[in-house]
A protein has these predicted regions:
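Short, polar/acidic, helix-capping and beta-turn segments at strand->helix junctions
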Residues: 1-113
């Protein structure tokens, strides 16, 4: 299809399956996971049209944004950054999103002549 729904991603350490102590590393891990999911489905990060970030420590807003910006080459998708209670496995960030594949232009009736 032309739409991909990305379920909640956490930035967990692959060895421990817990959030790392380093906030920047966790932000990179969560965004790397989103990118892997998006690209494995044949989409690009720039196909994301909506992203929701749940954050258990809202003081990490600027840190997350600094990492987040590096994953997009065009404009940014619409985004909500929501302060939340405790997330599973000690995570500070949970990310979900919606990607829509850009459709190739179709030839109109004049092109069929």
């Amino acid at each position: 299809g032309d739409t991909l729904y990305v379920a909640g991603h956490l930035g967990l350490d692959p060895q421990t399956q817990l959030a790392p102590a380093d906030v920047e590393l966790e932000a990179r891990l969560v965004m790397d996971g989103v990118k892997r999911t998006v690209e494995s489905a044949g989409f690009r990060m720039d196909d994301l049209v909506s992203v929701t970030v749940f954050c258990s420590d809202i003081s990490q807003y600027d840190t997350f944004n600094r990492i987040y910006r590096g994953y997009f080459s065009g404009g940014f998708p619409a985004r909500a950054f929501i302060g939340s209670g405790t997330l599973v496995r000690g995570a500070r960030f949970e990310v979900l999103g919606v990607a829509v594949r850009a459709k190739a232009p179709t030839a109109g009736p004049a092109a069929a002549r």
